[in-house]
Amino acid sequence: MTGKSVKDVDRYQAVLANLLLEEDNKFCADCQSKGPRWASWNIGVFICIRCAGIHRNLGVHISRVKSVNLDQWTQEQIQCMQEMGNGKANRLYEAYLPETFRRPQIDPAVEGFIRDKYEKKKYMDRSLDINAFRKEKDDKWKRGSEPVPEKKLEPVVFEKVKMPQKKEDPQLPRKSSPKSTAPVMDLLGLDAPVACSIANSKTSNTLEKDLDLLASVPSPSSSGSRKVVGSMPTAGSAGSVPENLNLFPEPGSKSEEIGKKQLSKDSILSLYGSQTPQMPTQAMFMAPAQMAYPTAYPSFPGVTPPNSIMGSMMPPPVGMVAQPGASGMVAPMAMPAGYMGGMQASMMGVPNGMMTTQQAGYMAGMAAMPQTVYGVQPAQQLQWNLTQMTQQMAGMNFYGANGMMNYGQSMSGGNGQAANQTLSPQMWK
């Protein structure tokens, strides 16, 4: 091979390489496979190796196949490839190919398609002259086949336009309906009905004064300005009531005024009238008549029921037993734990468990409460409240002529002989 021929081969390879760079020549003209390296120079198309074998079977009178890299090319062959190409050849041989046609991928189907395309010229535009079509310049058919390059449009700059904001309707202020405050109902009846707290302040103070069970006498400072509704005690009785509340007055000075300051039951009830609230049937400090001490011992006071307050404070009937002796003292025999005998004796009188004698001076400093404090006469059965009991206790004198009351004196009308009977030998067998 001469130098001239070597230069031509290199030049032809360069021309084929440039033809393969075109967009239509990058794919097989028949099966659209990528990267064809074979060509049918008489038809002027680039094909893949599989389609090249089928083209060889068609015969050299229809297709002549050459390799782009392995075979030597001549100037005539290069000229045929330059005149046609895949795009121009498909425009000629696939002019009537249906748009919905799908190119086959299996070898028998591909061979049948290639034979119909080049041997039978089934999809060829027969109106065109092949030689005249070959000699046409590439620019002429490219202008009609290739899409017109889109003009580069300048980027549109969108200006920010402030949209007019919708004017919101001014919200009308909602008129809040005043909440009706219902008067608070006192279901338990604990509050006293007061018409007006400001205008009737004196009336409310009066009601509070009436509801106080122990405030039987108005204070000296407010007695002139405030008037309590209801029957109030007179000035003479008002001064004597605080003194009557003292349960332990002095024996020397108070013994002379006992007759003047003792109040009757009618005067006590008249102090309160209708304003005094009634106590329940079972009074706090009262015991029914049937709960009194047995009639065999009339000198002892009545026994309070176990459910009352005074009954709960009293000890069980174990008590103390007084035995007469030379020393004149009381020898305690038994006493329940948690109780103070002296306090009970001074506050409650004689318990039902204490047995005494008629000798004077055995229980110094103690006095028996009258039977009327603990029990009510069966014929009367009146209900007393706390204030009435206080008035009765205030009017009593716990001291006798010698400064103390003899323990053996009977409050229920019994004599000394009945008290001595309690120490009979039969009681302790």
From Swiss-Prot:
Q: Do the record's keywords include Zinc-finger?
A: yes
Cytoplasm as a keyword of this entry, yes or no, is yes
* Post-translational modification Phosphoserine, affected residues: S127, S219, S223, S225, S231, S240
Location(s) in or outside the cell: Cytoplasm
UniProt GO molecular function: GTPase activator activity; zinc ion binding
- Enumerate the residue ranges of region (Disordered): 138-184, 217-259
Q: Where is the composition biased (Low complexity)?
A: 217-231
Q: List the disulfide bonds.
A: none
Coiled-coil residue spans: none
Q: Looking at the record, which segments are called Interaction with clathrin heavy chains? A: 163-232
Q: Zinc finger spans (C4-type)?
A: 28-51
Ranges where the record places region Interaction with PICALM: 340-429
Skewed-composition ranges (Basic and acidic residues) = 138-172
Q: Which PANTHER family match?
A: FI20236P1, STROMAL MEMBRANE-ASSOCIATED PROTEIN 2
Subunit structure, interactors included: Interacts with ARF1. Interacts with PICALM and clathrin heavy chains.
Chain's role: GTPase activating protein that acts on ARF1. Can also activate ARF6 (in vitro). May play a role in clathrin-dependent retrograde transport from early endosomes to the trans-Golgi network.
Q: What is this protein called?
A: Stromal membrane-associated protein 2
* The organism of origin for this protein: Homo sapiens
